[in-house]
Amino acid sequence: MDMDNLTLRYFDAEMRYLREAGKEFAEAFPDRAALLNLDKPGAQDPYVERLFEGFAFLMGRLREKLDDDLPELTEGLVSLLWPHYLRTIPSLSIIELVPDLAQIKRSERIARGFEILSQPIGPQRTCCRYTTTQDVTLQPLALASVARDHEPDGRSLLRLRFARSESVPWAEIDLSRLPLYLNADAPLASALHQALTLNRQAMYVRVAGQSGRMPMDGYFAAKGFADEDRLWPKGDSAFSGYQLLLEYFTFREKFMFVTLCGLDQLVIEPNAPWFDLEVVLREPWPHAFDLSAEHIRLHAVPVINLFVLEADPLELDPLQTDYLLRPMRLQDGHLEIYSVDEVTASKEEQRLDYVPFSSFRHKGGMLRDEAPERYFHTRLKRAANGLHDTWLILGGEGFDEDRLLRPDKRLSLRLTGTHGQLPRKALQSTVLDTAVQLTQFGLRVRNLCAPTLPCYPPNRDRFHWRILSHLGSNFLPMLDSAEVLRGTLALYDWTGSELNRRRLAAIVEVSHHLVQRFEKGFLLRGVDIEITLDANGFAGEGDVSLFGEMLNRFFALYADVHLYTQLTLVLQPTGACLRWSENHSQRIPG
């Protein structure tokens, strides 16, 4: 059992106390200690040991309850205003969908939610189920090779060769936006991301059979920051900037995507089997990093360990409002409930829906007269076995009528589930290689990175009180000092990763000042933010650039609606500066 299990930790503490206190008691009162067999060395009496274990378990649970910082108060408020803080972050990975170029005849769109199965793992040989988090378009196209080279004037150059299917002409391939995944270790992937998105100076295309090359007006756009790129569902009342931070600290691979734009303007000979894209860089490419086709992949997409889950119908009890939910098939004990999506009852062929309490559409909310009479709320509690139990709390006038007048009534549930830590129980060797749905062409699946461990909301260090203090404040106090900014960002790091700690510790100084100017007859107000970073806390300049891009996007979302933001990073010890353009809010953050 993992020592991160609080119940086990309290149990062990109570057992240690009983044994240590028992020795002292035996020395002070040997006649009475003899009755409990405490005065003799060696093996303890098994009946006394059972008594101690039972007492230690009960007292451990009691101490855990005394130390839990009143979750009944804080969790209710947090779940209403910031529900993302009480949700598990399931296991994540990146998969590659490789179509058979001999069979695919046109561009094929794979919708979000495409299911992938792992190879059987665990004692019960369970196949973990993952689903894609965004749409992906499969093209009759392959990235045949990736290499580095030099221009005649010495500038670094990256060469990408794209090859088409022999049966599909270039005119039928959609080249307008090609997502590419940078499949490498963090230092190389970050350097490649920076080179393509920030250090690109010129782009050329060289078509097979032609001696010269054509200039191209294209670019690589950073991917992973848009609303459609979210890894897990976002509640209607949740602020998207918080999820951005959680995704950055939990699964940075998500931001290792770039979108190649501008290839659709090319005129390519129909019979040409391939063309080379040459990217000339403004800064020299690091000599320590070699490149191959394995480092840039087409048709990659993030996947998450979430799937539709069946649950037993819920029988109402006249004396009960809280119900422990159990999946229909527990398998080997690693199946957990991620969310309750729908609760319904039936009355004389009429469907009665329970609405989420956080939607404010129940009779205690704003639409008092028109609102439904039934609502539900969920709460996550850690069980004694270390897993997380989901409790369903029902309420409303209609619910009171159902349970008192019709106690035999059953509710139907629609759940979303996850396999918890099972994908990482097999020594991190879980392989995702099976597509559930059939396609009209051959499709090979493989995961490009190991599935991550799930991350659970922190339950210590007065976590809920800290986020209430942070989220109740506005934008500018967060920029008062480096310590405040570090503490704010640390609330979103649930992994305990040493690399994340080093990045946060690298924030040396934070300053800001308000600026205003007239532009086209309007008074513009903004805040100029300057953050000094210790470059030694990052895995190269590319890592710094991605961290800055994340902060730039977060500040733009979090700032007051009447303020624009502009971020500048100053790197120590070199003194180099990275400055982003102004971000003008177009809508109220949310």
Residue ranges and their predicted role:
Residues 1-211, 217:
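Extended assembly-interface regions of large multimeric machines
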Residues 161, 167-371:
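Short, low-complexity Pro/Thr/Gly
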Residues 58-66, 84, 145-155, 161-174, ...:
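Extracellular ectodomain segments of secreted/surface proteins
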Residues 31, 347-590:
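C-terminal domain/tail detector
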